[in-house]
Amino acid sequence: MTKTAKVNDIVRDWVVLDAKDKVFGRLITEIAVLLRGKHRPFYTPNVDCGDFVVVINANKVKFSGMKLEDKEYFTHSGYFGSTKSKTLQEMLEKTPEKLYHLAVRGMLPKTKLGKAMIKKLKVYRDDKHPHTAQTSKKDAK
């Protein structure tokens, strides 16, 4: 018989991932799996059974190819002529937290459940974070 996860039975862990010298895309997929809860044996798609993920050294991540100069992110407020673009290099220097949230959000469900999952992601640009009391695991791999 298949066991499904109940909301009250889930015990969430805090996982700290160090992004220093890791490839961005591979790190993001690992984060998405942890947030979604797919690494657990009792994974249930309609229940949020993922862990809390703390990413440190967010701006020291590696990118392959020429993505830092070539990849652009666009924003549009809805007004004429308000399209703005930033390169990946600018995003990484100014707001690495937003960069991680954008990338992970694309890999999670586009529902209320996905919004609840993305709230469990904490990103910090250096190695100091305020979650030392909660963290139990370092580097899931």
Curated annotation (Swiss-Prot):
Q: Which residues cross the membrane?
A: none
- Tell me a GO cellular component: cytosolic large ribosomal subunit
Keyword Ligase appears in the UniProt entry: no
**A GO molecular function held by the record:** mRNA binding
Name the coiled-coil region(s). Answer: none
Would the keyword Ribosomal protein turn up in this protein's UniProt record?
yes
> Which InterPro entries does the UniProt record give?
Ribosomal_uL13, Ribosomal_uL13_bac-type, Ribosomal_uL13_CS, Ribosomal_uL13_sf
**Keywords in UniProt for this one?**
Ribonucleoprotein, Ribosomal protein
Classify the source by domain of life: Bacteria
GO aspect biological process, one term:
translation
What's a Pfam family this protein contains?
Ribosomal_L13
What's the stated role of this polypeptide?
Answer: This protein is one of the early assembly proteins of the 50S ribosomal subunit, although it is not seen to bind rRNA by itself. It is important during the early stages of 50S assembly.
The entry assigns this protein to a family as follows:
Belongs to the universal ribosomal protein uL13 family.
Listed under subunit, the entry gives: Part of the 50S ribosomal subunit.
Q: What HAMAP family does this protein's entry cite? A: Ribosomal_uL13
Q: Which NCBIfam families match?
A: rplM_bact (TIGR01066)
Protein name, entry field: Large ribosomal subunit protein uL13
Q: Which organism is it from?
A: Helicobacter pylori (strain G27)
